[in-house]
UniProtKB/Swiss-Prot annotation:
One of its GO terms (biological process) is ribosome biogenesis. This is GTPase Obg. It comes from Syntrophobacter fumaroxidans (strain DSM 10017 / MPOB). Keywords: Cytoplasm, GTP-binding, Hydrolase, Magnesium, Metal-binding, Nucleotide-binding. It is found in: Cytoplasm. Belongs to the TRAFAC class OBG-HflX-like GTPase superfamily. OBG GTPase family.
Length: 348
């Protein structure tokens, strides 16, 4: 399934039906009164967060969505039928913004959340509504109101318990493929992962949790370098950040540089990311045979004040301790996300 996380759409609600000018025309009733019916209400365009969606692919090639207009009123006090609402399903985690101003309008973060994007036009009143003591035979009726016309941007932010961040080739894809059933593309060159990847992680008897592999960042990402910040929005909804660092490539002179580079990019994107709980994962320890060097690097990273876990995603060394720590932190911070929808797409 192709992953689409941002689209622009044009929504139109239905127009209200016109009211009718009509008079009774019956045998033996030469002066029948007004009997024009009202026009029907126009249908509205409604967005609903659905458990069965995990991408905005349905909106990739179709951009115009219009609800039905209301029917016109008729004689004999027959009111026009209301137009049907147009209900558009989107994944939970979809933010809808005004296309012109960029202002966020609604955040459909939970399945079942609903938002009326364009409300249907009101139906016009028929002439039967205008009878008064001084006007017994009104020859006027109202036209229906026009529906609303809006251009919107739909922006999907994936929801996960743990978000993997780090430079390209830090081993994020390998890690998520080992600890879950996710099968991202893996190769020994930068930017192998071009889209976010979700996986369900099970560890012992603990409740499962959702992990997201976010495409690698590079210096200047917040200014558009590499893959830019397109996928940084997905990190905002994670509860824990797992910052992966390739320990085998650390420079003796500046061992903290890769970590600080990514942290700087995250801070440039959103100050709130700096407040998230995080763990530091020093990956590829199997490529550092010198024990003294390994211990020295771990010690340097421990000084940053976050839990540090030396691991090898390839050999699975240290993964048990890492997963146990993630489970503990998640249990302390609240209920994990439902995993059923993720499992439907990545397997169990």
């Amino acid at each position: 399934m192709k992953f689409v996380d941002e689209v622009k759409v044009h929504v139109l609600s239905g127009n209200g039906g016109n009211g009718c000018v009509s008079f009774r025309r019956e045998k033996y009733v030469p002066r029948g009164g007004p009997d024009g019916g009202d026009g029907g209400e126009g249908g509205s365009v409604i967005f609903v967060a659905s458990e069965g969606k995990n991408t905005l692919l349905d909106f990739r090639y179709r951009h115009l969505f219009k609800a039905e207009s209301g029917k016109h009123g008729q004689g004999r006090n027959r009111h026009g039928k209301g137009g049907r609402d147009l209900v558009l399903e989107v994944p939970a985690g979809t933010v809808i913004k005004d296309a012109e101003t960029g202002e966020p309008l609604v955040d459909l973060s939970h399945p079942g959340d609903r938002w009326v994007a364009a409300r249907g036009g009101r139906g016009g009143r028929g002439n039967a509504r205008f009878v008064s003591s001084t006007r017994q035979a009104p020859r006027i009726a109202e036209d229906g109101r026009e529906g609303e016309d809006r251009e919107l941007v739909l922006e999907l932010k994936l929801m996960a318990d743990v978000g993997l961040v780090g430079l390209p080739n830090a081993g994020k894809s390998t890690l998520i493929s080992v600890v879950s059933a996710a099968r991202p593309r893996i190769a020994d060159y930068p930017f192998t992962t071009l889209i976010p990847c979700l996986g369900v992680v099970r560890h012992g008897e603990a409740p499962p949790f959702v992990m997201a592999d976010i495409p690698g960042l590079i210096e200047g990402a917040h200014d558009g370098a590499g893959l830019g910040i397109r996928f940084l929005r997905h990190i905002e909804r994670t509860r824990i950040l797992a910052h992966l660092v390739d320990i085998s490539q650390l420079s003796p002179e500046e061992p903290l540089r890769p970590y600080r580079l990514i942290e700087s990019e995250l801070a440039s994107y959103s100050a709130r990311l700096g407040e998230k709980k995080r763990v530091i994962v020093l990956n590829k320890v199997d490529l550092v045979p010198e024990r003294d060097r390994l211990e020295a690097l771990v010690s340097r990273y421990e000084q940053l004040g976050h839990p540090v876990f030396p691991v090898s995603a390839r050999t699975k060394e240290g993964l048990g301790e890492l997963l146990s720590a993630l489970v503990r932190i998640l249990s302390e911070s609240g209920v994990s996300l439902p995993v059923e929808d993720v499992e439907e797409h990545v397997g169990k």
